[in-house]
Amino acid sequence: MNNTAQQDVSALSFEQAVEELERIVSALERGDVALDKSIEIYERGEALKKHCEALLKAAEDRIEKIRLDRAGRPQGVEPLDAE
């Protein structure tokens, strides 16, 4: 995949990338795409998948858990995975 196509993927929102990935999967499952085109869209699908995974990881990293004091009142936040 060329750099221009890769840059196009990085500019997509999560929702846009998932939508395009669903279209690619559908086209590949139908089997009505020529071999060369199948390889091309498969590679784009891989780039879209990686992009979605990166966006999900970034979102997970931003999620915080509300910390409560002994009385149950919010006291602050901490990373979701912190114990």
From Swiss-Prot:
Gene Ontology cellular component list: cytosol; exodeoxyribonuclease VII complex
The EC number(s) this enzyme carries: 3.1.11.6
KW Lipid metabolism (keyword) present: no
Subcellular location(s) of the protein: Cytoplasm
Catalytic activity, reaction form: Exonucleolytic cleavage in either 5'- to 3'- or 3'- to 5'-direction to yield nucleoside 5'-phosphates
GO biological process: DNA catabolic process
Principal subcellular localisation of the protein: cytoplasm
GO terms of molecular function: exodeoxyribonuclease VII activity
Entry annotated with the keyword Transport: no
This protein's UniProt keywords: Cytoplasm, Exonuclease, Hydrolase, Nuclease
Pfam family for this entry, one: Exonuc_VII_S
Highest taxon of source: Bacteria
SUPFAM superfamilies in UniProt: XseB-like
Subunit structure: Heterooligomer composed of large and small subunits.
NCBIfam families: PRK00977.1-3, xseB
Similarity-based family: Belongs to the XseB family.
Its job: Bidirectionally degrades single-stranded DNA into large acid-insoluble oligonucleotides, which are then degraded further into small acid-soluble oligonucleotides.
The protein's name: Exodeoxyribonuclease 7 small subunit
UniProt lineage: Bacteria, Pseudomonadati, Pseudomonadota, Alphaproteobacteria, Hyphomicrobiales
Gene that specifies this protein: xseB
